[in-house]
């Protein structure tokens, strides 16, 4: 059943990114995305260990509740839950099916290959836009920046797909043994970096630099990172919009004004926010910051739930990439005491022998690639509005799948409880609100 789920997840990912149903004649009226997604979710329901004890599966329905409350209390539109479900269920279900299907290292490599190929295809579409003026989707460029159809019509959103693909491409560089495959990985990495350049997205460029810096630091040390910065930053400033990244730039000034408006809205609607996707009713620009958008629209309570998804996913992949006492169980299995993250953490799964052929070093290398890609996404999301978009949930789904895969292999992984960590996340949420307020006060 899991193989069928993996196949359905791959098909859905291709349809979501490449979107042939939107430009291939005869498919426009067929809801292929919805059909494949529901099929994948149905297959997930019949899989064995779904991993529903993970905090992500408790956060998702709770996030929907607070979205509804924000619409009703803050926005005065209780019926908006229908629209919210239509837009939020697909990315949430993407997290679910990815976490259920992309668990083994081999599955991650295949799925990452699909993601990289899809991203490279979008780069080629952008290249056609630059050279001929139009790609096969018929979408035009926006102010000299490449676009695509559907959810990647915005070059900023497309750029964050490239960031994830770059992180996964580096994973293939680190694990491939054949000369041809390594050459292919290097070529693809260069092609994806070309795509980042074509997006001309400053947030994407900073995110890409973050991924590259972390990878270089992990392999060569901080001296190499400093060298990279000395070389790369002046080049980017000279040839991209990074030269305009200051508070006096009109675009940057608009972002800061949007951040200020978001903080002000939070003070006016502190508990439940102004209402999901209602920020634009109060400001001409979107927040251009995922945290500000979530805190303004969902209030402190909903923002804390949203931040729980981000924080616990990040903490989870951090501990997998850089484990403390993360060791394979001896064979035959014996009872051990699992180190817990909090006093009220979930109980550990039944002990199991390590799976045959399990390569702990390769697994941790994969976890580090996902961690670095997630860090890059976080940097980009700080300057872009990604609070409810598919790329956030895809990153969290890959992290959850990595955790479940290593747990199934018999590794002692820390248990994570949403409720036990909620006070900590609430503290982080309040600290981030104060931090954004101080940042805006400094920049204005």
Language-model features, listed with the residues they occupy:
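A membrane-periplasm/extracellular boundary helix in multi-pass inner-membrane enzymes
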Residues: 124-133, 194-199, 215-253, 257-268, ...
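Membrane-interface micro-motifs in multi-pass membrane enzymes
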Residues: 27-34, 83-84, 150-162, 200-203, ...
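Membrane-interface helix caps and helix-loop-helix hairpins in membrane proteins
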Residues: 23-25, 73-82, 197-198, 243-251, ...
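Hydrophobic cores of alpha-helical transmembrane segments in multi-pass inner/ER membrane proteins
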Residues: 36-43, 91-99, 160-171, 393-402
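Juxtamembrane membrane-water interface segments that cap and precede transmembrane helices
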Residues: 16-23, 137-151, 272-296
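Alpha-helical transmembrane segments of multi-pass inner-membrane proteins
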Residues: 67-72, 93, 109-143, 150-218, ...
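TM-adjacent membrane-interface loops and short helices in multi-pass inner/ER membrane proteins
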Residues: 252-308
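Transmembrane signal-anchor hairpin modules in multi-pass inner-membrane enzymes, especially those
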Residues: 1-72, 79, 83, 106-109, ...
């Amino acid at each position: 059943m899991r193989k069928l789920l993996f196949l359905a997840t791959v098909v859905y990912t291709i349809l979501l990114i490449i979107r042939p149903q939107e430009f291939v004649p005869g498919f426009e009226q067929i809801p292929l995305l919805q059909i494949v997604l529901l099929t994948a979710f149905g297959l997930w329901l019949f899989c064995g260990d779904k991993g529903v004890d993970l905090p992500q599966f408790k956060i998702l329905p709770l996030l929907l509740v607070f979205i509804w409350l924000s619409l009703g209390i803050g926005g005065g539109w209780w019926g908006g839950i229908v629209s919210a479900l239509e837009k939020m269920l697909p990315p949430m279900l993407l997290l679910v099916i990815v976490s259920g299907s992309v668990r083994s290292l081999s599955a991650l490599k295949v799925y990452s290959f699909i993601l990289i190929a899809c991203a490279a295809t979008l780069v080629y579409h952008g290249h056609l836009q630059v050279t001929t003026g139009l790609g096969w989707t018929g979408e035009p460029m926006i102010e000299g920046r490449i676009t695509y159809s559907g959810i990647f019509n915005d070059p900023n959103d497309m750029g964050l797909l490239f960031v994830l693909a770059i992180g996964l491409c580096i994973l293939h560089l680190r694990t491939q043994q054949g000369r041809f495959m390594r050459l292919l990985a290097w070529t693809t990495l260069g092609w994806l970096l070309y795509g980042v350049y074509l997006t001309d997205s400053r947030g994407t460029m900073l995110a890409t630099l973050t991924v590259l810096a972390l990878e270089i630091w992990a392999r060569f040390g901080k001296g190499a990172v400093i060298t990279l910065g000395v070389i790369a930053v002046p080049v980017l400033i000279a040839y991209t919009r990074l030269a305009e990244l200051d508070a006096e730039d009109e675009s940057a000034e608009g972002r800061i004004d949007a951040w200020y408006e978001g903080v002000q809205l939070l003070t006016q609607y502190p508990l439940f926010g102004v209402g999901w996707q209602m920020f634009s009713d109060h400001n001409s620009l979107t927040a251009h910051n995922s945290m500000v958008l979530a805190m303004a629209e969902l209030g402190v309570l909903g923002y804390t739930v949203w931040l729980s998804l981000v924080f616990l996913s990040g903490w989870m992949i951090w501990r997998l990439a850089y484990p403390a006492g993360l060791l394979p169980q001896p064979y035959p299995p014996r009872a051990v005491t699992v180190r817990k993250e909090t006093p009220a953490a979930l109980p550990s799964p039944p002990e199991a022998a390590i799976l045959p052929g399990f390569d702990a070093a390769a697994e941790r290398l994969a976890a580090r690639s996902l961690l670095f890609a997630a860090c890059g996404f976080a940097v980009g999301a700080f300057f872009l509005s990604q609070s409810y978009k598919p790329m956030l949930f895809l990153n969290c789904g890959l992290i959850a799948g990595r955790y479940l895969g290593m747990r199934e292999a018999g590794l002692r992984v820390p248990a994570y409880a949403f409720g036990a960590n909620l006070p900590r996340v609430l503290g982080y949420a309040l600290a981030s609100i104060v931090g954004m307020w101080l940042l805006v006060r400094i920049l204005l």
